[in-house]
C-alpha cells in the first residue's frame, strides 16, 4: 500500500479536519506498536514523529531480539519469562525479521566473572525451560574449553574454562519499526514523520484536547485535535510531558548511552554471536556479532545528559570497547582506524528502580543451595504447583546478595511504565524492543477503557499476538520455504540469486511488490537493479524522504556496507532528486546531510 510523501501530506491535511480518537507522539518502536494496534482495532488514529521513524533510539540497539539470559544474573525470573514469551510472539507476527542465532558464551576464571560453568549451566537450563526449548535441538549446550576454541579459535585462551551455547535471535530494529508503521498506515492511521509537537490544546477544565504541531519540512504550524494523546517519545518523554505541565516538572527518565562499533570481518572473524564479560571487573558483558561480512561489538552503558537528538561516540567509548575486544581476541589488534561504522543510541530508562538488569552483572555471592531452591520453585511455578508469590518470595530471599547497592547505569530498570497525568496526557515509557507489543497492548487496554468511560466510544481490541506486521504475512512454520519462493520470483525479474535472497529476507511478504517494480522501472544510473527497486519501494511505500532515511534505516547500508557505500551515495541522491523533483539547492542540502551522517558514522572527528 502506498505510504509516501503524498500520503504524508494527505495525512497532515486529514489530521486537521477531524477529532482523532488517539494521537500518538513518537514514531519509534513503542509508538509504532501502539499505532498498529489502535488502527487495527478501529480507532481513528494519528501518529507524528519529529524525525524519521526509529531515528531517535529504535534504530540504535544491539540489533537482537533478546531472550534475556543476562537477566538471570540478577534472577529476574519474571522478566525472562515475559521476555522469551514476547520474543516468540514477535517471531509469529514478524517472521521475516527475527532470525535464530545461537549465542556463544565463553566463561573465564577471573575476578568478578558473571558465571561459573556450573552457574551458567543452571541459568541456561532455566532459560530454556522458560523459553520452551528444553529437550529440543535449540536447547543449550555446555562446552569444554576445547569445544569453545573449536568454535572460536581466536578467543583468548588464558583463563578460559569452557562456555555454553544458547538460543538468541538477531533483529533488524529499524525494519521492525517501519513494518509496524506500514501496517498501521494500511489499517487507516494518519501518519507523518518530521512533524513536531510544540504544545498542547486544552479545554476549559485544563484537559488536553490535542496538540500544536509544526511540519518541519514546510514550517507550517497547525492543530491536531484528539480525544486522547499518548506520549511514546522514549528519551524525550519528560520533555513532552513538561510541555503540558504548568506545575512541577517531570524527571522520570534516566537515559543511558550505548555505543557499537563495526569492523571488517577480517579483523575479527566470529562464526556466531559471542557474549562475554568485559574482564574489567565492572560486572558488564559485551557482544561481538557477525553481520553482512562485518563484525560489530558493544555496548557501553553510561549515564547521558547531552543532546538527545545527536548522541556521539567519544574517545572514551572507543577506548573502552577496543580494550575489551582486543583483550578477548588477542590477535585482532584493532585500532580506531579499523572502525568502518559506528552508532550511539540512548536507552529510555526509568530511574529509581533496579529490578531489571540490561547489561550489568551482580557481584553477590550466592550459595548453590539458594540457587537450586530458586530453580525448583520456578519449575513448580511453571507446572502450576507454585504461585507467582512463591517465585517472588524465592527471588526476594536472594536480593541481599544479588541486588546492586547503588543504581549504576547498567542496573536502571528496563521495565516500562504507563502514566496518566491530571491533564489527561498518557505517557508510555521505558521497556525493551522485545517487549514493544506487550507494552502497546497494555496501553491500548487503558486507552479503550478511557474512551468508553469518558467519551462513550466503544472498541474491541484485536488479538495483537497473531496480527502480523507489514511483510509478516508468512506461515511462521514455513518461513524459509516461502522466502525461497519469493527469492526465485526476484530471480525471474532479473536479479541475481544473492540480491533476490537479500531482498526477500528484508521485505518478507512484501517482496513480490518490490520485485513487481521491475516491470515499470529502469535500473537507475550507478545503482544495481536491487538498489533501484529497494530505493523506489522505500520512497513509494516506506516514506523515505532523504538519502539518510534510505541508507541508514530502510536499509543498513551505512552500517554494514560502508566499504561500497561511497559509490552509491551520488546515484541515490540523483535518483531521489529526480523522483522528488528536487532543486539543485535542495539536493545540495541532502548531500550535506549525508556528509554529516557519514562523518558521525565514520568517527571522522576522532580519527583526525
Give the predicted meaning of each segment.
Residues 193-209:
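A conserved short coil-to-beta-strand element within the FAD-binding core of flavoproteins
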Residues 26-28, 50:
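Glycine-rich Rossmann-fold phosphate-binding loop(s) that bind the pyrophosphate
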Residues 10, 14, 51, 93, ...:
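C-terminal accessory subdomains/tails of enzymes that are appended
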Residues 39-59:
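Glycine-rich FAD pyrophosphate-binding loop
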Residues 24-25, 224-234:
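Short hydrophobic core segments
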Residues 63-147, 151, 286:
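Dinucleotide-binding Rossmann-like beta1-alpha1 core, especially the glycine-rich loop
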Residues 18-20, 217-228:
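Core beta-strand elements of the Rossmann-like FAD/NAD(P) dinucleotide-binding domain
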Residues 1-22, 37-41:
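Extreme N-terminal leader/targeting segments of oxidoreductases
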Amino acid at each position: 500500500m502506498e505510504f509516501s510523501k503524498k500520503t504524508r501530506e494527505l495525512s497532515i491535511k486529514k489530521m486537521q479536519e477531524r477529532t482523532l480518537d488517539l494521537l500518538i507522539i513518537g514514531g519509534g518502536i513503542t509508538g509504532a506498536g501502539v499505532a498498529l494496534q489502535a488502527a487495527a482495532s478501529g480507532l481513528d488514529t494519528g501518529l507524528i514523529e519529529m524525525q524519521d521513524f526509529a531515528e531517535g533510539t529504535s534504530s540504535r540497539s544491539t540489533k537482537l531480539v533478546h531472550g534475556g539470559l543476562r537477566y538471570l544474573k540478577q534472577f529476574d525470573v519474571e522478566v525472562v519469562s515475559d521476555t522469551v514469551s514476547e520474543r516468540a510472539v514477535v517471531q509469529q507476527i514478524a517472521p521475516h525479521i527475527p532470525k535464530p542465532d545461537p549465542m556463544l558464551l565463553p566463561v573465564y576464571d577471573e575476578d568478578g566473572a558473571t558465571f561459573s560453568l556450573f552457574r551458567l549451566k543452571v541459568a541456561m537450563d532455566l532459560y530454556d525451560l522458560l523459553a520452551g526449548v528444553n529437550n529440543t535441538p535449540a536447547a543449550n549446550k555446555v562446552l569444554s574449553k576445547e569445544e569453545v576454541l573449536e568454535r572460536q579459535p581466536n578467543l583468548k585462551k588464558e583463563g578460559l574454562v569452557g562456555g555454553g551455547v544458547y538460543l538468541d535471535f538477531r533483529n533488524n530494529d529499524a525494519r521492525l519499526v517501519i513494518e509496524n508503521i506500514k501496517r498501521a498506515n494500511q489499517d487507516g492511521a494518519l501518519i507523518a514523520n518530521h512533524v513536531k509537537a510544540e504544545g498542547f490544546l486544552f479545554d476549559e477544565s485544563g484537559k488536553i484536547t490535542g496538540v500544536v504541531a509544526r511540519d518541519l519540512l514546510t514550517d507550517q504550524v497547525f492543530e491536531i485535535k484528539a480525544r486522547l494523546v499518548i506520549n511514546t517519545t522514549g528519551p524525550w518523554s519528560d520533555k513532552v510531558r513538561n510541555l503540558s505541565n504548568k506545575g512541577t516538572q517531570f524527571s522520570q527518565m534516566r537515559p543511558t548511552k550505548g555505543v557499537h562499533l563495526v569492523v571488517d570481518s577480517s579483523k575479527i572473524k566470529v562464526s556466531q554471536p559471542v557474549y562475554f564479560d568485559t574482564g574489567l571487573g565492572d560486572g558488564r558483558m559485551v557482544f561481538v556479532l557477525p553481520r553482512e561480512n562485518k563484525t560489530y561489538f558493544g555496548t557501553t552503558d553510561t549515564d547521558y545528559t547531552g543532546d538527545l537528538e545527536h548522541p556521539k561516540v567519544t574517545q572514551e567509548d572507543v577506548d573502552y570497547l577496543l580494550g575489551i575486544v582486543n583483550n578477548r581476541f588477542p590477535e585482532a589488534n584493532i585500532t580506531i582506524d579499523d572502525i568502518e561504522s559506528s552508532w550511539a543510541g540512548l536507552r529510555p530508562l526509568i530511574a529509581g528502580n533496579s529490578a531489571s538488569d540490561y547489561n550489568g552483572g551482580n557481584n553477590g555471592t550466592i550459595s548453590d543451595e539458594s540457587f537450586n531452591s530458586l530453580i525448583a520453585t520456578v519449575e513448580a511455578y511453571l507446572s502450576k504447583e507454585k504461585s507467582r508469590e512463591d517465585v517472588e518470595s524465592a527471588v526476594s530471599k536472594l536480593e541481599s546478595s544479588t541486588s546492586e547497592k547503588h543504581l549504576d547505569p547498567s542496573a536502571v530498570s528496563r521495565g516500562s511504565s504507563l502514566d496518566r497525568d491530571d491533564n489527561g496526557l498518557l505517557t508510555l515509557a521505558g521497556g525493551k524492543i522485545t517487549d514493544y507489543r506487550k507494552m502497546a497492548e497494555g496501553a491500548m487496554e487503558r486507552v479503550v477503557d478511557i474512551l468508553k468511560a469518558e467519551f462513550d466510544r466503544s472498541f474491541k481490541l484485536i488479538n495483537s499476538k497473531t496480527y502480523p506486521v507489514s511483510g509478516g504475512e508468512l506461515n511462521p512454520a514455513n518461513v524459509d520455504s516461502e522466502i525461497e519462493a519469493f527469492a526465485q520470483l526476484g530471480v525471474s525479474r532479473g536479479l541475481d540469486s544473492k540480491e533476490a535472497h537479500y531482498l526477500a529476507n528484508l521485505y518478507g511478504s512484501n517482496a513480490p511488490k518490490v520485485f513487481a517494480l521491475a516491470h515499470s522501472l529502469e535500473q537507475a544510473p550507478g545503482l544495481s537493479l536491487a538498489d533501484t527497486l529497494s530505493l523506489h519501494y522505500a520512497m513509494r511505500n516506506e516514506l523515505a524522504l532523504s538519502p539518510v532515511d534510505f541508507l541508514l534505516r530502510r536499509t543498513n547500508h551505512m552500517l554494514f556496507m560502508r566499504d561500497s557505500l561511497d559509490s552509491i551515495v551520488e546515484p541515490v541522491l540523483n535518483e531521489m532528486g529526480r523522483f522528488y523533483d528536487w532543486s539543485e539547492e535542495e539536493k545540495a542540502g541532502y548531500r550535506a546531510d549525508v556528509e554529516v551522517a557519514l562523518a558521525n558514522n565514520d568517527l571522522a572527528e576522532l580519527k583526525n
